[in-house]
């Protein structure tokens, strides 16, 4: 090992020099002040947790992105957080346990085993706001408006927002009656819009034809605002409850 190699950071791991650090700290304060003005309470989750707690309710992708290590005190497997969202959900459910809606925000470093792209970072600064205990259009709109104001504070221009309706997907999964493993596999194929793979899997699992047709249609329902009219027509058989 040369003297140069000794001081090289691992791939995807970055450090900020004074000018960059000062700029980022200014944005951090501005964003957290914004969240505070909206009634969001700051939490600081731990950087490391036991793996089973860290990955509760998460998918396989997060599992693969999580660094693991052994706790020298008891031999249990621990994980370095790759996403703070499950931690916020755990704090809301098991530490606070409020009946009224809870607004929480957070900012901290997360670590990924692999970068998103060929030259991407693995050590990222994540900021987020979560509204727990309220389901409906009002809470969706609040989070969306807060996100747009966050981007404005960070001076990010030319914003493009993709909107989806997760209730449609959940209802179709309920109709399909898939196992957890099958749901994860199908979700991965839907994310990649891999229609031939979706058709093959649904046929292999003997999913009812109406549900199969709608899951395939779901992979093609994207585009401008007129896609909503197509969705109402193609997914009409799902009934009420998703027509928001």
Q: What residues fall within each predicted segment?
A:
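Charged, compositionally biased N-terminal leader segments and the immediate start
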Residues: 1-8, 173, 178, 185
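Positively charged, Gly/Ser-enriched RNA/tRNA-binding surfaces
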Residues: 2, 13, 20-38, 49-52, ...
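Generic N-terminal amphipathic, Lys/Arg-enriched alpha-helix
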Residues: 7-17
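Polyanion/phosphate-binding surface patch
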Residues: 46-78, 120, 124
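Acidic, His- and aromatic-enriched active-site or binding-groove loops in soluble protein domains
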Residues: 64-73, 177-203, 207-208
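Short active-site oxyanion
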Residues: 76-78, 155-160
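Short, conserved phosphate-binding/catalytic loop or strand-edge motifs used
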Residues: 123-127, 163-171
């Amino acid at each position: 090992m040369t003297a140069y190699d000794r001081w090289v950071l691992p791939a995807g791991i970055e450090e900020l020099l004074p000018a960059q650090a000062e700029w980022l700290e200014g944005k951090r304060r501005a964003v957290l002040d914004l969240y505070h003005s909206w009634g969001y309470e700051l939490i600081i989750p731990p950087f490391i947790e036991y793996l089973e707690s860290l990955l509760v309710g998460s998918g396989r992708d997060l599992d693969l992105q999580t660094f693991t290590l052994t706790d020298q005190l008891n031999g249990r497997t621990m994980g370095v957080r790759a996403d703070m969202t499950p931690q916020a959900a755990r704090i809301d459910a098991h530490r606070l346990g409020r009946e009224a809606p809870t607004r929480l925000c957070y900012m901290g470093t997360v670590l990924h085993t692999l970068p998103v792209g060929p030259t991407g970072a693995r050590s990222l600064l994540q900021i987020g706001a979560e509204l727990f205990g309220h389901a409906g259009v009002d809470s969706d709109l609040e989070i969306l408006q807060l996100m747009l104001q966050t981007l404005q504070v960070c001076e990010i221009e030319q914003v493009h927002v993709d909107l989806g309706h997760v209730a449609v997907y959940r209802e179709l999964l309920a109709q399909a009656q898939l196992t957890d493993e099958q749901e994860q596999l199908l979700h991965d194929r839907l994310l990649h819009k891999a229609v031939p793979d979706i058709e093959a899997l649904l046929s292999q699992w003997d999913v009812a034809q109406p549900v199969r047709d709608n899951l395939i249609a779901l992979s093609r329902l994207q585009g401008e605002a007129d896609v909503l009219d197509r969705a109402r027509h193609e997914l009409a058989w799902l009934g009420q409850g998703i027509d928001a």
